[in-house]
Design a protein with these regions (language model features):
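Extracytoplasmic gate region of multi-pass secondary transporters
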Residues: 37-41, 162, 166-170, 243-291
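Glycine-rich segments within core transmembrane alpha-helices of 12-TM secondary carriers
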Residues: 142-174, 383-396
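Helix-to-loop junctions at the C-terminal end of transmembrane segments
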Residues: 69-82, 300-314, 404
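Conserved MFS/SLC helix-loop-helix module at the cytosolic interface between two early adjacent transmembrane helices
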Residues: 68-110
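Central cavity-lining transmembrane alpha-helices of secondary-active solute carriers
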Residues: 57-75, 291-304
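Intracellular juxtamembrane helix-capping segments at the cytosolic ends
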Residues: 125-139, 361-376
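C-terminal ends and interior cores of transmembrane alpha-helices
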Residues: 91-106, 323-342
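Extracytoplasmic
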Residues: 18-46, 130-131, 161, 268-276
C-alpha cells in the first residue's frame, strides 16, 4: 500500500527543496527522451526511406500514447501512490527503449514506432504524476515560477539530446554518404542503410538500462506522497454538486489549450531541421537548430523566474507569450530575407521559428495553474485530462507533414497560427469560464 499522503503546506522547507530537486531530475529525463525525436525524424527519414508524413509518425507514435494512457495512469497512481507509479513508468519506458534493438537489427520502422509508443506510455504515467505534484508544491501564485524551473531542466536536456545523439550516431563522413545514397545500387544502398540504422543499438541499450535503474531509485527516494486533491472549505462548497470533470469548463478549455500549445511547440522543434535543410544547410549543420529553439525557451523560463510574480503576474506573461506566438507565426510564412548569423547563412524566417521557443516557454506554466484552479478532489483526474492534451504533439506534426508534402515546408507553418490564436483567447477569456 502507498504511504498516506500529506498536504504540501505540512512539508518542512528541506522536504520541499528535496522534492523540487527530485522532480527537476524527472523533468530532465522527460526532456531528453522527448526532444531526441527532433533528430530521430530526419535520421529515420533517411535510414528507413520515408516521406515527410511517414517520418512525422515518430511524434505521432510517441505522443498518441498520452491520449491512450493518461486516464489509466491517473487510476494507477491512485492505487499505487506517486513513487510506485513513477517506478512503473520508468520500467515501461525501459521496455520501449529496448524495443529499439530488434527494430534496428531488422531496420523495421514499425517496431521503432512501437518502441516510441511504449516510451510515451511510460512518460504518460510520469507526467500525470509530476505536473500536478509540482503545481501544488507551494503557493498557486508562484506555480508558474516552479514550472519554469522544471522547464529549464526539460529544455536543457532537450538542447543536449539531439547533439548527444548526433555525436554518438553520426560520423563526419555521413554528409558524403547521404549525398551518394541516391546513386548507389540497391544492394549497396541497403547495406549502407542497415549499418546507419544499427548505430542506435548501443545508445538505446544504455538508455533502457538507465531507465530501469531510475525506477528503483525513485521508488526508494525521499520523495514524499503529497495530497494533490486537498480541498479548502470554499472549494469543497463550490464543488459540492460536481459529479464529473466535464463540469469544469476552464479545465476542458485548458486541456484544449495544452493540445494546441504542445503541438505548436513540437512543430517548432521537430520541423526546424528539415526546414533548415530546405535552405541548403546539410544535416550535420542543421542539427544545431533544435537546440537554438530550446535555448530560446530557456531564456523565456529564466525571464519568468526573474519577473513572476514580483514584476508581472503569470497571467500577464501568458498573454504576452501567446500574442508573440501569433505575430511570429505570421512572420514565418510572410517574411523572406537572407540573413547571416554566426556560421549560418539562412532565410530570416528560420530565426522566427527559433524565436517561437521564447513564445512557447511560459505557456505551459501559465495554463496549468489556471486549469487546475479549484478542482479539489478532481485534481488527479483533471491532471490526466491535461496530460491527454499532449496528444497534440502526435496529431499536429502529422498535419504539418501533410502540408509540407503537398505544398512546402514553409507554407506548412500556417498550421500553428490558429493554435496561438486560441491560446490567446484562453489567456484573455477562456480561463475565467466556470459554467458552460
Amino acid at each position: 500500500m502507498p504511504t498516506a499522503p500529506i498536504h504540501a503546506r505540512d512539508l518542512t522547507p528541506g522536504q520541499t527543496r528535496v522534492s523540487i530537486a527530485i522532480i527537476a531530475v524527472l523533468f530532465f529525463i522527460f526532456g531528453f527522451v522527448s526532444w531526441v525525436n527532433a533528430i530521430l525524424i530526419p535520421y529515420f527519414k533517411i535510414g528507413c526511406e520515408l516521406t515527410h508524413f511517414e517520418a512525422y509518425l515518430v511524434t505521432f507514435a510517441f505522443y498518441i500514447s498520452y491520449l491512450v494512457f493518461s486516464m489509466p495512469a491517473a487510476h494507477l497512481l491512485k492505487r499505487t501512490g506517486f513513487k510506485r507509479g513513477m517506478m512503473i513508468g520508468f520500467w515501461v519506458m525501459a521496455a520501449g527503449a529496448f524495443l529499439f534493438i530488434p527494430a534496428a537489427m531488422t531496420r523495421t520502422y514499425g517496431i521503432f514506432l512501437g518502441g516510441l509508443f511504449t516510451l510515451g506510455a511510460g512518460l504518460a504515467i510520469l507526467q500525470t504524476a509530476a505536473n500536478p505534484y509540482i503545481t501544488v508544491l507551494g503557493p498557486k501564485e508562484t506555480a508558474a515560477r516552479r514550472i519554469s524551473v522544471m522547464g529549464i531542466c526539460n529544455k536543457g536536456a532537450g538542447i543536449l539530446a539531439p547533439l548527444v545523439f548526433a555525436a554518438v550516431v553520426f560520423k563526419v563522413t555521413d554528409t558524403d554518404l547521404f549525398a551518394r545514397l541516391a546513386t548507389m545500387a540497391p544492394a549497396e544502398k541497403a547495406a549502407a542503410l542497415d549499418e546507419l540504422i544499427r548505430r542506435v543499438v548501443m545508445p538505446y541499450a544504455c538508455v533502457g538500462t538507465a531507465l530501469l535503474a531510475l525506477g528503483f531509485l525513485v521508488r526508494w527516494s525521499p520523495l514524499p506522497e503529497i495530497d494533490t486533491e486537498h480541498e479548502t472549505a470554499d472549494v469543497a462548497e463550490a464543488n459540492a454538486d460536481k459529479t464529473g470533470i466535464l463540469q469544469f469548463p476552464h479545465l476542458i478549455l485548458g486541456a484544449l489549450g495544452i493540445f494546441l500549445h504542445v503541438g505548436a511547440s513540437v512543430i517548432s522543434v521537430d520541423t526546424i531541421i528539415p526546414y533548415a535543410q530546405s535552405m541548403g544547410l546539410p544535416l550535420l549543420e542543421a542539427k544545431a537548430f533544435p537546440s537554438y529553439v530550446l535555448t530560446a525557451m530557456i531564456c523565456g523560463y529564466v525571464t519568468g523566474i526573474l519577473l513572476i510574480p514580483r514584476v508581472v503576474s503569470q497571467l500577464t506573461m501568458l498573454r504576452f507569450c501567446t500574442g508573440l506566438g501569433v505575430v511570429l507565426s505570421v512572420l514565418i510564412v510572410t517574411m523572406r530575407a537572407p540573413v547571416s548569423y554566426g556560421s549560418h547563412v539562412t532565410d530570416i524566417s528560420l530565426w522566427f521559428v527559433v524565436l517561437l521557443g521564447f513564445a512557447n516557454s511560459l505557456t505551459w506554466a501559465g495554463i496549468w495553474p489556471l486549469a487546475l484552479d479549484g478542482l479539489g478532489r478532481f485534481t488527479k483526474v483533471g491532471a490526466s485530462v491535461m496530460i491527454m492534451g499532449l496528444c497534440g504533439n502526435a496529431i499536429l506534426p502529422l498535419g504539418y507533414g501533410w502540408l509540407a508534402d503537398h505544398y512546402s515546408v514553409r507554407d506548412a507553418y500556417w498550421i500553428i497560427l490558429p493554435c496561438y490564436l486560441y491560446l490567446t483567447y484562453y489567456a484573455l477569456v477562456g480561463h475565467k469560464k466556470r459554467v458552460w
